[in-house]
Amino acid sequence: MKTLILFSTRDGQTREIASYLASELKDMGIWADVVNLHRAEEPDWDSYDRVVIGASIRYGHYHSAFQEFVKKYATRLNGMPSAFYSVNLVARKAEKRTPQTNSYARKFLMSSPWRPDYCAVIAGALRYPRYRWYDRLMIKLIMKMSGGETDTSKEVVYTDWEQVAHFAREIAHLTNKSSAK
């Protein structure tokens, strides 16, 4: 069994989550290729039993390359077991960590031609020292308005790694379902 994990990241946390998922899956005997969606050519879909795509939010939007990829390959994505994870800082609040309660994930899923079998909303990381001055200022303003961390000397990882491990187990279950057909 082999899994394709594609990610769209801006500051690296979505890639970290993709790598963690691959490690968890490997521990379950499932091999995974982790690929940056921004650098990916068309996947060899037939080489994989399922696909997972992760995408991060910046200033309220997913990267356009992610949106275009999903539109271009929706038929392929819908034709195999698939999962989606959204990474954003709103999800640092536990009540905003489901596709139903997270507005970014909900809007994407409602408008997307892709219908993943399983979805997760995962909190990202706040990495002020790594941001350009403009991003640091804007993100600080957003965090102040939403009651988040505003100390620009800090890096805070909000990702709940046990939630990511649970997501990996759900992904493994998707593979088992598809092989039972």
Swiss-Prot record:
Residues 3-172 form the Flavodoxin-like domain. It catalyses: protoporphyrinogen IX + 3 a menaquinone = protoporphyrin IX + 3 a menaquinol; protoporphyrinogen IX + 3 a ubiquinone = protoporphyrin IX + 3 a ubiquinol; protoporphyrinogen IX + 3 a quinone = protoporphyrin IX + 3 a quinol. Its EC number is 1.3.5.3. Pathway: Porphyrin-containing compound metabolism; protoporphyrin-IX biosynthesis; protoporphyrin-IX from protoporphyrinogen-IX: step 1/1. PROSITE patterns: FLAVODOXIN (PS00201), FLAVODOXIN_LIKE (PS50902). Pfam families: Flavodoxin_5 (PF12724). Its cofactor is FMN. Keywords: Cell inner membrane, Cell membrane, Flavoprotein, FMN, Membrane, Nucleotide-binding, Oxidoreductase, Porphyrin biosynthesis. Belongs to the HemG family. PANTHER family: PROTOPORPHYRINOGEN IX DEHYDROGENASE [MENAQUINONE], PROTOPORPHYRINOGEN IX DEHYDROGENASE [QUINONE]. This is Protoporphyrinogen IX dehydrogenase [quinone].
